[in-house]
């Protein structure tokens, strides 16, 4: 299972680490994903969801 948000599809992005002497090395920026129990069609399932979707009320948390 890939580290991708199941709601919006947000995943890993690539970029550079830049040192003081301006040397650039490749690095990756991971999305802030959390395991959350969500309610889908009346049933409860676990899903990897980014914090932006959690805070934006794009999911309904299971109680």
From Swiss-Prot:
Belongs to the bacterial ribosomal protein bL28 family. GO terms for biological process: translation. One of its GO terms (molecular function) is structural constituent of ribosome. InterPro entries: Bacterial_rp_bL28 (IPR050096), Ribosomal_bL28 (IPR026569), Ribosomal_bL28/bL31-like_sf (IPR034704), Ribosomal_bL28_bact-type (IPR001383), Ribosomal_bL28_sf (IPR037147). This is Large ribosomal subunit protein bL28. It comes from Brachyspira hyodysenteriae (strain ATCC 49526 / WA1). Keywords: Ribonucleoprotein, Ribosomal protein. It holds the Pfam family Ribosomal_L28. One of its GO terms (cellular component) is ribosome.
């Amino acid at each position: 299972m890939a580290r991708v948000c199941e709601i919006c599809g947000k995943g890993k992005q690539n970029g550079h680490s830049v040192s003081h002497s301006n040397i650039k090395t490749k690095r990756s920026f991971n999305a802030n994903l959390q395991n959350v129990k969500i309610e889908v069609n009346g049933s409860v399932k676990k899903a990897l969801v980014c914090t932006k979707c959690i805070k934006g009320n794009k999911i309904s948390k299971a109680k």
